[in-house]
Swiss-Prot record:
Keywords: Ribonucleoprotein, Ribosomal protein, RNA-binding, rRNA-binding, tRNA-binding. InterPro entries: Ribosomal_uS7 (IPR000235), Ribosomal_uS7_bac/org-type (IPR005717), Ribosomal_uS7_CS (IPR020606), Ribosomal_uS7_dom (IPR023798), Ribosomal_uS7_dom_sf (IPR036823). This is Small ribosomal subunit protein uS7. The keyword ATP-binding does not apply. GO terms for cellular component: small ribosomal subunit. GO terms for biological process: translation. It comes from the Bacteria. The gene is rpsG. Pfam families: Ribosomal_S7.
Amino acid sequence: MPRKGPVAKRDVLPDPMYNSKLVTRLINKMMVDGKKGKSQTILYNAFDIVSERTGKEPMEVFEQALKNIMPVLEVRARRVGGANYQVPVEVRPERRTTLGLRWLVNYARLRGEKTMEERLANEILDAANNAGASVKKREDTHKMAEANKAFAHYRW
């Protein structure tokens, strides 16, 4: 913890093409070794693939996909009397978005398609249709929270 008061939250600038801070955050999540331009190109090409396949605005599809990925509940470890309990807690809005973006990028990277653009586009499309690995991750997280409901009174 910092000694000089709370750390100021840094705000990202909206991206040039879609004028969205959410897209900028996704670009930053995808970025490897500081290559932001490369990350931007990959995302925009993935959005082009999404709009080709669906005929809809890629931002609409992306927002729907993110909505389907973002968790509402998660479990956090709490130590009580020598035992660790998995306590279900509600996820703050900022963390929900962060987890959604992180899972989207991570599971897109694990897919089998040839290029990252195809992987990302397909993961976005799957998530928008409530399928895919990132949606499964959310379901697993919710199942864990549901299974540990008995420890909800340990919430802090």
